[in-house]
Amino acid sequence: MPHFNPVPVSNKKFVFDDFILNMDGSLLRSEKKVNIPPKEYAVLVILLEAAGEIVSKNTLLDQVWGDAEVNEESLTRCIYALRRILSEDKEHRYIETLYGQGYRFNRPVVVVSPPAPQPTTHTLAILPFQMQDQVQSESLHYSIVKGLSQYAPFGLSVLPVTITKNCRSVKDILELMDQLRPDYYISGQMIPDGNDNIVQIEIVRVKGYHLLHQESIKLIEHQPASLLQNKIANLLLRCIPGLRWDTKQISELNSIDSTMVYLRGKHELNQYTPYSLQQALKLLTQCVNMSPNSIAPYCALAECYLSMAQMGIFDKQNAMIKAKEHAIKATELDHNNPQALGLLGLINTIHSEYIVGSLLFKQANLLSPISADIKYYYGWNLFMAGQLEEALQTINECLKLDPTRAAAGITKLWITYYHTGIDDAIRLGDELRSQHLQDNPILLSMQVMFLSLKGKHELARKLTKEISTQEITGLIAVNLLYAEYCQNSERALPTIREFLESEQRIDNNPGLLPLVLVAHGEAIAEKMWNKFKNEDNIWFKRWKQDPRLIKLR
C-alpha cells in the first residue's frame, strides 16, 4: 500500500467554519497559521476528501502509515491530537467516531479548486430520434442537445439543433458528416411499449462509420427528458476515449469569495427561520451567479425554495417551479449527484409522480446510502404522503447523522403531533429546545400552539414573548393566531379574519384550513377541503392529517 503524500502539488483548498486547509500542508484559522503535524494533516485530508462518508480505521492506517508497523492506538492518538488542533468541543464536533466502523468528518466542507485545463474536444452530432409524433421528436431532440451541451467545459462539443434538426434520411446523414466532419454521432428510435417507450440508441464513430455501442433504454411515462440525457451521457463516457468529466470537480466552487458566500448561505438555510431563509435565498442566488458550474449552490437553492414554500413565505407554485429548475440544473452538471437526485425525487413525489420519484430516490440512496440530505428529503416525502410511521423512522435516521438539522427536527415535531398526539409533541418540543433549537421561532410557535391546545395559557403566553416580531409571518403567524383563538376564543376571531383577508391566494393554501375552520365555520372550511381534495392539491396531503381538522375528514 503506497504512503500518503502529505504535500501534493495542487491549488485545491478545503474550507470549513473559519478554517482553510491548503494542499501544501498548511492550516489557517481566521487567516492565522495553525501548526498541524504531517500525520494529523494526512488524516484530516482523507476525512475531508470523503465528504461526510465514513472512513474505516484500516483505510486510514493503510493510507497514512503505509507498511509501517502500527496499531489502532496510533490512529486514536492522532485523532485526539487532531481534535485539539481544531479546538473541538461538545458543541462543535468536527470528527465523529462510529464505533466498529471508523471516523467521519461531521461539518459542512466546501472544496475550492481553480478551473482545470481544457481537455481535448470531441465533436458530437445528435440526430433527431425516429418517433411517430414529429412534434415530440423535435422537442426531445432539442432537450437532449441542450442537456449534453452542458458538458462543453469537459471536452464535448455538440452541434446545434439548427444544423441537425432536418437530418433524417441516410442521404442527409452522409452529407452532414461529409461537410462538418464531427467525431461521433448519436441516432435513436423510439418504439411504444404499452404506456412506456423503448428508445434504441446507437453511438457511431464517423471515421469508418464504426458502430461503438447499441443499447435499448426503457422510458417510463412522464419521465423527464433529463433522465434520458443522463443515461446517454453515461454511455458517451464509456464509448469515447479521452472524454472525462470529473463529477467531483464540478461540485467544487472556484474561488474563496464564492465559497464564503456559499457557506454563509448554507448557514442561513440551516437556521430554518423565515428571516434566515430569505437571507439564504439572496446569498445562494449570488453564489450561483459567481460559480455557475458548481453543483452545491443549485442544490441548496432548490432546498431553500421548497423550505420557504413549506413555511408559507413564498408562493408555493412558483417555489416548486424554481426548485425544480435548480435541481435539474444540478443534475445537468452531474447526473449522478445524490443530493440533486434526492431533491428531484421529492419534487416529483410532491407532484404525485410517484414512479419517477421512487426511481430517483432509489438511485440517490444507492449512490449515497449514508446521507443526512437524502434521509431528510425522503422523510419529508413520506410525511407529505401521510406515511407517518415510516416518515418518523427516516427523519430519526437523518437526525442521527446530523442532530443539528433544524428542518428535520421541526418535521419530526409535526409528525409526532400528527401520529402520536399532543402530549408527545410537547415533550419532544421541550427536548428539541434543550438541544439545538432553543431559539428557533418555528419550534417556539408550535410549542405555543400545543400548550394553548392543552389549556396551558400562561406558559404559552410566556413562550410567545421569546419570538422576534420580524419572524412572525407565514406558518409562525398561523400557529400564533390559532394559539390566540385557544386562549381567547371568540375575542380572537376578528384578528384571525383580518389576517385571512390579507392573505393572497388563500384558495391555494391548505395550511390556512385550521384558521378558516374556527373563523368562518365548518361549511366554508369543508368547501375549501373538498376543493383541495378534488384538485389533488400537492400541499393538501400534508395538512389533511392535522388533528385540528378531524371534523372535515
Curated annotation (Swiss-Prot):
<dbReference type="InterPro" id="IPR019734">
    <property type="entry name" value="TPR_rpt"/>
</dbReference>
<feature type="DNA-binding region" description="OmpR/PhoB-type">
    <location>
        <begin position="11"/>
        <end position="107"/>
    </location>
</feature>
<dbReference type="GO" id="GO:0005829">
    <property type="term" value="C:cytosol"/>
</dbReference>
<comment type="function">
    <text>The main transcriptional regulator of the Salmonella pathogenicity island 1 (SPI1) gene expression. Activates the expression of invasion genes by a direct action at their promoters and also indirectly by increasing the level of InvF. Also binds upstream of prgH and directly activates the expression of prgHIJK operon.</text>
</comment>
<keyword id="KW-0238">DNA-binding</keyword>
<dbReference type="GO" id="GO:0000976">
    <property type="term" value="F:transcription cis-regulatory region binding"/>
</dbReference>
<dbReference type="GO" id="GO:0006355">
    <property type="term" value="P:regulation of DNA-templated transcription"/>
</dbReference>
<dbReference type="InterPro" id="IPR011990">
    <property type="entry name" value="TPR-like_helical_dom_sf"/>
</dbReference>
<dbReference type="Pfam" id="PF00486">
    <property type="entry name" value="Trans_reg_C"/>
</dbReference>
<dbReference type="GO" id="GO:0000156">
    <property type="term" value="F:phosphorelay response regulator activity"/>
</dbReference>
<dbReference type="InterPro" id="IPR001867">
    <property type="entry name" value="OmpR/PhoB-type_DNA-bd"/>
</dbReference>
<keyword id="KW-0802">TPR repeat</keyword>
<protein>
    <recommendedName>
        <fullName>Transcriptional regulator HilA</fullName>
    </recommendedName>
</protein>
<feature type="modified residue" description="4-aspartylphosphate">
    <location>
        <position position="62"/>
    </location>
</feature>
<keyword id="KW-0010">Activator</keyword>
<keyword id="KW-0804">Transcription</keyword>
<keyword id="KW-0597">Phosphoprotein</keyword>
<keyword id="KW-0805">Transcription regulation</keyword>
<dbReference type="InterPro" id="IPR016032">
    <property type="entry name" value="Sig_transdc_resp-reg_C-effctor"/>
</dbReference>
<dbReference type="InterPro" id="IPR036388">
    <property type="entry name" value="WH-like_DNA-bd_sf"/>
</dbReference>
<keyword id="KW-0902">Two-component regulatory system</keyword>
<keyword id="KW-0843">Virulence</keyword>
<feature type="repeat" description="TPR">
    <location>
        <begin position="372"/>
        <end position="405"/>
    </location>
</feature>
<dbReference type="GO" id="GO:0032993">
    <property type="term" value="C:protein-DNA complex"/>
</dbReference>
